[in-house]
Curated annotation (Swiss-Prot):
GO CC list: nucleosome; nucleus
Assembly mode: The nucleosome is a histone octamer containing two molecules each of H2A, H2B, H3 and H4 assembled in one H3-H4 heterotetramer and two H2A-H2B heterodimers. The octamer wraps approximately 147 bp of DNA.
Domain of life: Eukaryota
Organism listed in the record: Echinus esculentus (Sea urchin)
GO terms for MF: DNA binding
Annotated protein name in UniProt: Histone H2B.1, sperm
The family this protein is said to belong to: Belongs to the histone H2B family.
Motif interval(s): SPKK motif 3: 16-19
Length: 26
């Protein structure tokens, strides 16, 4: 799970899709 925080904080573009696809990414 710590890996998800790294890419999310580094890539501001990934923050957008992760907000709506948080359950799909998990």
């Amino acid at each position: 799970m710590p890996s998800q925080k790294s890419p999310t904080k580094r890539s501001p573009t990934k923050r957008s899709p992760q907000k709506g696809g948080k359950g799909a990414k998990r």
